[in-house]
């Protein structure tokens, strides 16, 4: 079960983010940004909101592909000012608590956003690590570009 989680739950799990733990819950839940959690079953979220989470993904909506956190913030705010949601879903951090859950949440959220017509492109803002590169390439993404501090991958549906 995938659900968009609120700031209260985000506050309790930020410490587990291995990529961007410095981004607070206000950043993650404002300016057309959302945080999704993958739960063990459909009832876990109702009874144990911050327990039984298998994976987490943070998404920002932009109209341009960001090269770093500063551009991510700027582009999502600009998309928000237009009174519309950006058409690019940027997955800027993902982590999992169980094997295979990272892949599951990326693929499920991308499909859900695509089916709901909430985004037309699905890209990442990933760290320049071998682990991030292997994860995304192994899960069907293509490398778009490498920058000074980050790299972008794109998932197509």
Which residues are covered by each model-predicted region?
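Conserved acyl-donor/pantetheine-binding loop and adjacent beta-alpha core of acyl/acetyltransferases
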Residues: 58-89
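Conserved GNAT acetyl-CoA-binding A-motif
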Residues: 89, 115-128
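Conserved acetyl-CoA-binding loop of GNAT-fold acetyltransferases
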Residues: 137-147
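Conserved beta-strand-loop-alpha-helix junction that forms the acyl-donor binding cleft
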Residues: 96, 123-134, 147-157
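Conserved acetyl-CoA-binding loop-helix of GNAT-fold acetyltransferases
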Residues: 96-115, 138
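Short amphipathic alpha-helix that is part of the acyltransferase structural core
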Residues: 1-43, 47-48
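Alpha-helix-centered segments that form part of catalytic cores
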Residues: 84-100
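Glycine-rich phosphate/pyrophosphate-binding loop shared by adenosine-nucleotide-utilizing enzymes
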Residues: 46-57, 89
């Amino acid at each position: 079960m995938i659900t968009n989680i609120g700031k209260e739950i985000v506050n309790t799990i930020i410490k587990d983010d291995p990529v961007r733990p410095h981004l607070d819950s206000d950043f993650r839940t404002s300016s057309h940004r959302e945080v999704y959690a993958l739960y063990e079953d459909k009832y876990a979220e109702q009874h144990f909101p911050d327990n039984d989470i298998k994976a987490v993904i943070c998404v920002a909506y932009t109209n341009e592909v960001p090269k770093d956190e500063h551009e991510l913030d700027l582009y999502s705010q600009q998309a928000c000012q237009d009174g519309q949601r950006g058409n690019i879903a940027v997955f800027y951090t993902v982590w999992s608590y169980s094997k295979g859950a990272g892949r599951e949440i990326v693929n499920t959220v991308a499909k859900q956003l695509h089916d709901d017509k909430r985004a037309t492109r699905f890209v990442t803002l990933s760290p320049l690590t071998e682990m991030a590169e292997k994860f995304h390439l192994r899960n069907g993404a293509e490398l778009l570009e490498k920058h000074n501090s980050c790299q972008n991958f794109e998932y197509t549906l």
